């Protein structure tokens, strides 16, 4: 995705702030372990992402918000936790390959990567 590549380069150069849910990193690890993502690619991403993005783990407040989002938008809980983490962190955009998150309409823009 061209726009995602440009955003990544900007973050790597210190322009703006990226935020990533710790759960997204765990998901990358899982994908690497099960072979859905090449192990080397997963390892590279797991090193690179925290180097340029602030890693945020959900707390109870985020969990409560996620439960409501999951219920209201019919999202799987992990997806709702990622969304709630972005909202609690004050993110303006959420970049994702998860089409389910496209159902969210609100304070942040969901960018679906295809």
Feature names for model-found ranges:
Residues 46-47, 54, 58, 73-74, ...:
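Internal alpha/beta domain cores that form substrate/cofactor-binding pockets in large enzymes
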Residues 23:
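Short strand-turn motif at the edge of the Rossmann-like AdoMet-binding core
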Residues 54-97:
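Active-site neighborhoods of divalent-metal-dependent phosphate/nucleic-acid chemistry enzymes
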Residues 30-33, 87:
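Short glycine/serine- and small hydrophobic-enriched flexible loop segments
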Residues 10, 83-114:
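Acidic, PIN/NYN-like endoribonuclease modules and their adjacent C-terminal/linker elements
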Residues 1-20, 32-47, 99, 112-114:
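Short, well-structured N-terminal submotif of metal-dependent ribonuclease cores
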């Amino acid at each position: 995705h061209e726009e995602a590549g440009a955003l990544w380069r900007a973050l790597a150069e210190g322009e703006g702030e990226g935020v990533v849910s710790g759960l997204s990193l765990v998901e990358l690890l899982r994908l690497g372990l099960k072979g859905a993502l090449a192990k080397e690619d997963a390892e590279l991403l797991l090193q690179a992402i925290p180097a340029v993005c602030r890693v945020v783990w959900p707390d109870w407040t985020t969990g409560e918000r996620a439960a409501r989002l999951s219920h209201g938008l019919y999202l799987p809980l992990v997806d709702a936790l990622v969304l709630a983490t972005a909202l609690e962190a004050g993110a303006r955009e959420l970049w994702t390959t998860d089409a389910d998150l496209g159902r969210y309409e609100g304070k942040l823009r969901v960018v679906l990567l295809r």
